[in-house]
């Protein structure tokens, strides 16, 4: 009986710790705020998609993460988008 209560308390402790780590990570990245702004009103139905999209590029290096690795891409500075090869 003692073994079962110990396992239960350990499981609760681990779940609390991991949930706190997840909430801190969301605060650091700002993901919670982006979703909160997008879901605040029905007038902003398409806002969640645009807020969570990748940031516009500023250099060609930024396009390496958005384009396939082998082909790569080039940053279109005028539009702030990546043109993949």
UniProtKB/Swiss-Prot annotation:
SS bonds (residue pairs): 57-75, 63-82, 67-84
Q: Main localisation, per the record?
A: secreted
Q: Might you report a single GO cellular component term?
A: extracellular region
GO process annotations (BP): defense response to fungus; killing of cells of another organism
Keywords, sorted A to Z: Antimicrobial, Disulfide bond, Fungicide, Plant defense, Secreted, Signal
Residues making up the signal peptide according to the UniProt record: 1-25
The domain of life for this entry's organism is Eukaryota
Report the subcellular localization: Secreted
Family that this chain belongs to = Belongs to the DEFL family.
Q: What is this protein called?
A: Putative defensin-like protein 258
Q: Which organism is it from?
A: Arabidopsis thaliana (Mouse-ear cress)
């Amino acid at each position: 009986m003692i073994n079962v209560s110990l396992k239960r308390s350990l499981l609760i402790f681990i779940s609390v710790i991991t949930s706190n780590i997840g909430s801190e990570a969301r605060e650091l990245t700002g993901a919670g705020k982006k979703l909160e702004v997008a879901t605040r009103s029905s007038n902003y139905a398409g806002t969640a998609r645009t807020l969570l999209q990748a940031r516009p590029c500023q250099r060609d290096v930024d396009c390496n993460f958005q384009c396939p690795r082998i082909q790569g891409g080039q940053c279109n500075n005028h539009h702030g988008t990546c043109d993949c090869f």
